[in-house]
Amino acid sequence: MSSYAPATPSPTPPVGHLDLVPTPTGDIPTIVDAARAAYDHGVTRSYDARIARLRALRAVLVDGEAELLEALRADLRKPDIEGWATDIAVTIGEIDFMMKHLRRWMRPERVRLPLASMPGRARVVREPLGVALVIAPWNYPVQLMIGPMAAAIAAGNAVVGKPSELAPTVATTLGTLIARHLPGDEVGIVQG
């Protein structure tokens, strides 16, 4: 068994390594505008839409598990068990938790008022804000991309994600899997 020291990278890229094709700069406003239009039309806000997108995001991880593990191995030299435990399983657990609690999170919550405001009533109504940008780092490129995307989707927002260019195989794989499972106008990906 050979070892690898990250401080002294190998002179050749690992097998399966992909060169990242960056999104042309001129295409970025189109991706953001599509996400903004999806949000403005209200397609991201209903409970059913949020659950459907969370299920699709979960399917990215479940259906693409082998591809993601291979990409993590190629870019970061993560053993499969580490990639599964730290990037995939944890994120599936996060999404499952969000799906379990989403209906309750969406309900307005009554809150107490100070005596000076009586006989008034108050409640907290959680509303989405629009388009969320998720920029993922290289060290946990799946977990720190999909987890925040899931949170933004659960909140009812459209999302634009940018995987780390320092993990190009993972970035390309995530882009392909997300495009396969989620509507591009609600969840856009920018590479580079």
Language-model features: locations:
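Rossmann-like NAD(P) dinucleotide-binding subdomain of oxidoreductase/dehydrogenase enzymes
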Residues: R112-G192
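N-terminal Rossmann-like NAD(P)+-binding subdomain of aldehyde/semialdehyde dehydrogenases
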Residues: S2-R123
